[in-house]
Regions:
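Catalytic nucleophile loop of clan PA
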Residues: 63, 169-189
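Canonical tetratricopeptide repeat
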Residues: 273, 307, 341-342
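Flexible, gly/ser-rich surface segments that form the specificity/activation loops bordering the active-site cleft
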Residues: 25-29, 33, 76, 116-163, ...
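C-terminal cap/linker of serine protease catalytic domains
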Residues: 21-38, 188-252
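N-terminal activation segment of mature serine protease catalytic domains
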Residues: 19-63, 70, 82, 249, ...
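Conserved active-site neighborhood of the chymotrypsin/trypsin-like protease fold
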Residues: 55-57, 66-144, 159-162, 220, ...
């Protein structure tokens, strides 16, 4: 079993004001979407089913990107000898597909399904703490399930940005769509890290758009494993830092972060994890240097602002703590609330 558990589940510039059409601003403190807005998005979801040679069944979520095309995760269809989608109890079988096995993105083509497509957005201009909407068809749920969340990190990878978000996945929801608050499709939910404090990863819509330009392949063609299912040492660094970070294995985290920085010297997230490792290893001066490098590239990096605020509080620097409150609150009220909790004596 891979360390990063396969879960059957399946950001955009700020908008100044909400529109009467249901468009919502993408600022961190934006109002929650209306029920009518969410209902319109739900109409484009389908349940994806697959069967394998041993008689087993797999389930996931898909979303229509044209009246004839549905995108989902390839691992939902992997090694299947039968696949279909269903909408309000009516099933359709695909006639062809396009596959990006490496990035775990597959697009099925149908005839006569006459699906309601969503509008594809942009995954290259998203920002940390941007609100998102995840809609899935988990397990045996007969109706779509909505989860609201925020973008927590963006990882440059293979020419696009893999998104980590706070919107949790549930079993049966692989391939579910992630929307911005304008209702545009920006990512496909794909996998989670192990543990109770899991990281939830979403594949960028850029890869979906690129896949649409590729040729179709026969159904049930032999599949390949995605990048996240490789041995640990071959996985992206943004996956490799999670367990040592969450388990407090600071020396190991430093080793992984050093390797990450060697490969990507300007990576914001690599610098952040390096700073965190040095801080917890007792190297406060080095940690501060790395944190400052993060802020040079990303002045509003939430985790770094919070870490420096906690260090200021420990040093009794009341003025810096107050600046941290103001900075976090300007990004998202919830971040300041989290900071307030972190300041309380443990």
């Amino acid at each position: 079993m891979p360390k990063f558990l396969l879960m059957s589940l399946l950001l955009a510039s700020l908008t100044a004001h909400a529109q009467d059409t249901g468009v919502f601003p993408n600022s961190s403190n934006a109002a929650a979407p209306s029920e009518d807005f969410l209902y319109q998005l739900k109409e484009s979801l389908v349940k994806v089913s697959s069967t394998v040679k041993n008689g087993g069944h797999g389930y996931g979520t898909g979303v229509a990107i044209s009246k004839d095309h549905v995108v989902t995760n390839c691992h939902v269809l992997q090694d299947s000898n039968g696949m279909s989608i269903s909408k309000w109890g009516v099933a359709f079988a695909p006639v062809a597909m396009i596959a990006d096995w490496e990035h775990d993105i597959c697009i099925m083509r149908f005839e006569w399904a006459d699906l309601k497509p969503v509008q594809m957005g942009d995954s290259e201009n998203l920002h940390y703490e941007q609100p998102i909407v995840s809609i899935s068809m988990p397990g045996d749920s007969p109706a779509p399930y909505v989860t609201l969340g925020k973008i927590k990190a963006l990882y440059p990878f293979d020419g696009a940005n893999v998104m980590r978000a706070s919107a949790a996945f549930a079993i049966g929801a692989s391939g579910s769509p992630v929307f911005d608050y304008n209702g545009k499709l920006i990512a496909i939910s794909t996998l989670k890290s192990p543990g109770q404090k899991a990281y939830f990863y979403n594949m960028p819509i850029k890869w979906v758009k690129e896949l649409l330009t590729k040729p179709e392949i026969p159904l049930y063609q032999a599949s390949k494993s995605p990048f996240w299912d490789a041995p640990d040492e071959a996985r992206p660094f943004f996956m490799r830092v999670v367990l040592p970070y969450q388990n407090g294995q600071w020396a190991e985290l430093k080793t992984v972060a050093q390797a990450w920085l060697k490969q990507e010297p300007t990576s914001t997230e690599a610098l952040y994890y390096m700073a965190t490792a040095e801080q917890n290893l007792g190297n406060a001066k080095l940690a501060n240097q790395y944190y400052q490098q993060v802020l040079k590239q990303h002045p509003n990096h939430p985790a770094t602002l919070m870490a420096l605020g906690l260090l200021a509080n420990k040093a009794g620097n009341v003025a810096e703590v107050e600046k941290t409150h103001l900075a976090l609150k300007a990004i998202d009220d919830a971040l300041d609330e989290e900071f307030i909790e972190a300041l309380k004596p443990q």
